[in-house]
């Protein structure tokens, strides 16, 4: 049986891994998942990530904790296969009044809502992270 929403599965693995205080989580890799992991690393929500394997590549995310607490307080899927959510540059949301990020897929790649606003780009809102 094929997976219906691999991005929601990725976010759930991160959420569950941090709830169980795991050091790292692994999942099947894709270009979009690697791009999202790169944004999460740049913004300081995960420690690191790496892709291993050639035939069936696996993405391993090293989770980040601060004083024993998970850095990611909440991670929520927004646009999903059954209901895509697109926003123009002036409609991009601010998550937790700017304390969190919205991961946006634009024509120039996957980036934060802040970076998309500065570049003057809109796109598909993938998820909110705080």
Curated annotation (Swiss-Prot):
GO terms for biological process: translation. PROSITE patterns: RIBOSOMAL_S8. Transmembrane segments: none annotated. NCBIfam families: PRK00136.1. Belongs to the universal ribosomal protein uS8 family. PANTHER family: 40S RIBOSOMAL PROTEIN S15A (PTHR11758). This is Small ribosomal subunit protein uS8. It comes from Klebsiella pneumoniae (strain 342).
């Amino acid at each position: 049986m094929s997976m219906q929403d691999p991005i929601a599965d990725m976010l759930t693995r991160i959420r569950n891994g941090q709830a169980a205080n795991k050091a790292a989580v692994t999942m099947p890799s894709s270009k979009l998942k690697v791009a999202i992991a790169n944004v999460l690393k740049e913004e300081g929500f995960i420690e690191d990530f790496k892709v291993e394997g050639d035939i069936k590549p696996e993405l391993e995310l090293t989770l980040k904790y601060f004083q024993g607490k998970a850095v990611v307080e909440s991670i929520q899927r927004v646009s999903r296969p059954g209901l895509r959510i697109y926003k123009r540059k002036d409609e991009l949301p601010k998550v937790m009044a700017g304390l969190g990020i919205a991961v946006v897929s634009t024509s120039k790649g996957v980036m934060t809502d802040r970076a998309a606003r500065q570049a003057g780009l809109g796109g598909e809102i993938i998820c909110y992270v705080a």
